[in-house]
């Protein structure tokens, strides 16, 4: 039948790690295998020892047909009540109404002012190295084999969304 799990994480797993790094490869595997169903942003200051923003990642290895190839993002960051007295860094709790609104939004799987739905390809990118030739007196420096040497001081990188064709991207952006 399949399994669905929810994991509470900070923001780092969403964006850390260059393409090919461990973090990036884990994220890539989850998305390529169509297991990321939803990410819910939570209010900050929900936990005792930190005020950081947190997120619930919902993973599902048996998505319904309408959810296949898609990721639902829900902004639940405004659904909280302030505590009368802070408990360490914890100064908020998710309100009952907020929990119900998040759950209903998740179940409905429709875009709204707090819900966005994207194709999986929206979340991946290819990291491309952009080189410029090393020049001496305005002439490109080459190796003994005749290859142009790159100027490492001018090296740059482009993060190209998987949904874009690399050649089209460079024509349009670089």
Describe each model-derived feature in a short phrase:
Residues 1-173:
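A conserved structural/catalytic subdomain of Rossmann-like adenosyl-cofactor enzymes
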């Amino acid at each position: 039948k399949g399994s669905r799990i929810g994991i509470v994480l900070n923001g780092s797993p969403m964006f850390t790690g260059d393409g090919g790094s461990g973090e990036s490869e884990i994220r890539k595997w989850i998305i390529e295998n169509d297991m990321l169903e939803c990410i819910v942003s939570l209010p900050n200051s929900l936990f005792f020892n930190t005020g950081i923003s947190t997120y619930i990642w919902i993973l599902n290895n048996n998505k319904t047909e309408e959810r296949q190839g898609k990721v639902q993002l829900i902004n639940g960051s405004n659904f909280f009540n302030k505590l009368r007295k802070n408990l360490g860094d914890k100064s908020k709790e998710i309100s009952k109404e907020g929990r119900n609104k998040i759950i209903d939004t998740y179940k409905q799987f429709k875009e709204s002012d707090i819900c966005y739905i994207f194709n999986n390809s929206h979340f991946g990118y290819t990291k491309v190295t952009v080189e410029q030739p090393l020049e001496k007196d305005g002439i490109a420096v080459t190796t003994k084999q005749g290859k142009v040497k790159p100027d490492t001081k001018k090296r740059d990188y482009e993060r190209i969304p998987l949904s874009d064709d690399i050649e089209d991207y460079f024509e349009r952006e670089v």
